[in-house]
Amino acid sequence: MQKHSNLENKILKLLNTEVMEERAKIPKKIMFELTNLCDLKCQFCSTHISKRKKGFMEFDFFKRVIDEAMNLGIEECALFTTGESFLHPEVMKFIDYSSQFDLYTYISTGGRCLSEELMDQILSSGLKSIKFSIDAGNEETYKIIKGCDVSLDNLHHTIKYLYKSRNEMKSDLNI
């Protein structure tokens, strides 16, 4: 264990306090719920039973919040909380806007809403990462967890297409 002098301890305490106070003032990540609609009924999620009014975030509100957050030094932008963001009819507008900044912009999806055309748009958008909610290792368990008639094989096909297209387009999207 390294010993510090009394003066060193005071300096370390002062530095740690100032650094922590400064970091605490400014959030580094912002998360958006683009919609609270979802095409699944996952066993672990309350979105499908929520009594909240269903709807979509307005782009002008999103733009205003992003602009203000950028002025505060935000570093990450998550385009999901509950709901399936790709059900929003203007999802690419949100992705394109947030991706134009020096932000690590990412999204999570169940994957059912992703057409090949939409995936190609995603690959050229500047989105940094897309995460897939898989939640099971076999078809039977997947259907139980997702709470509806879904296909794990279809999701695998979607992810494989995205990987193949990413390599062909030389995109830097993390999957």
Short names for language-model regions:
Residues 2-129, 141-145, 149, 153, ...:
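Conserved alpha-helical substructure of the radical SAM core
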Residues 136-139:
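A glycine-centered beta->alpha junction motif in the catalytic cores
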